[in-house]
Amino acid sequence: ELKKTETIDVMDAVGSNIRVDTYDWEVKRVLPRINEEINEEWISDKTRYACDGLKNQRLDTPLIKNNGNFEEISWQDAYKKIKEKISITPPDKIVGLTGDMTNMETMFAVKNLFQKTLNSSYLDSRAKHTYINFENRSNYLFNSGIEGIEESDLILLIGTNPRFEATILNSRIRKTYLKNKTEIFSLEDVGDLTYPYKVLENNSKVIDKIIKNEHNLSNKIASAEKPIIILGQSILNSKNGAYIFEAVSYTHLTLPTNLS
C-alpha cells in the first residue's frame, strides 16, 4: 500500500540517492538507493530518521502575516495576494529568496519568473550570506566527485566537520585512509572523525603561508598526485570567507599540483 518515490536526499550537500515510502500524506520511511558514485548503498541517520519530524513540523498550507501573527489561507487567496502586491511594487523593490531545502525545479521556476516576467534580478538562496564565486563552475562543484575521494593521497579540511555535516562523505574519507593511509589535515580540531588527522593552526595566515609556499604543507600538496581541499559552510560564512575561498581557488596556480 506504500507509494514508493525515488528522489535525492536534501539533508546535506552530498545528494544521496534515496527512496521515500509514503502512505497518503505521511512519509513512512526513507531507504537508500544504490549509487556507487555517491552514497553506495548507505544513507546517514539524519537522512533515515528526519521524516519522524514531518508529522508535527510540516508546512503544507500557505501562511500570511497579519498584525505580527501568521494565519493560514488557501492557495487561491495566497496567489491573489501575491499578484496584488506585485502589481503595485516596482521591479527593483521585489526580492526573491529561496530556502535551503528548495528543489532545483522550483528554484529554476522562480528564476524564470523574476527575470522574464517581473524584470527583476534580485534573487538569492543564501540566507546566511555564504560567499561563493559563481564565475567559474569549478568554484561550486565537488570537483573530484564523491567517489574520487578514494583516489586522493592528501586531504585538507578547512572549516568543516564532515562527520557531522556530511556523514556519507566522511565515510569515504575514512575508507580512503584505511585503504591508502591518506594524509589528512584540518585547520582546526573538530573532534573524533573516526580516522586520525593532523591539526594546523586555526587562522587565515596559515592558508596564506600554504598558498605562498611558505608552509610545510605546501610541499606535501605540491608533491601529492591527487590532493583535495574541502571547504565547509562555517568558513564561507565567516568574515574571512571571501579571502579564504579565493585564495584556495588559486592554489593550483601557485603550487604545481593537480588540486581538486
Task: Give the predicted meaning of each segment.
Residues 83, 248-249:
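Generic solvent-exposed, charged/amphipathic alpha-helical segments
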Residues 210, 247-248:
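Short amphipathic C-terminal alpha-helix that caps PH/PH-like domains
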Residues 238-245:
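Glycine- and acidic-residue-enriched helix-capping/strand-helix junction motifs
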Residues 250-260:
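Single conserved hydrophobic/aromatic residue that forms the stacking wall/gate
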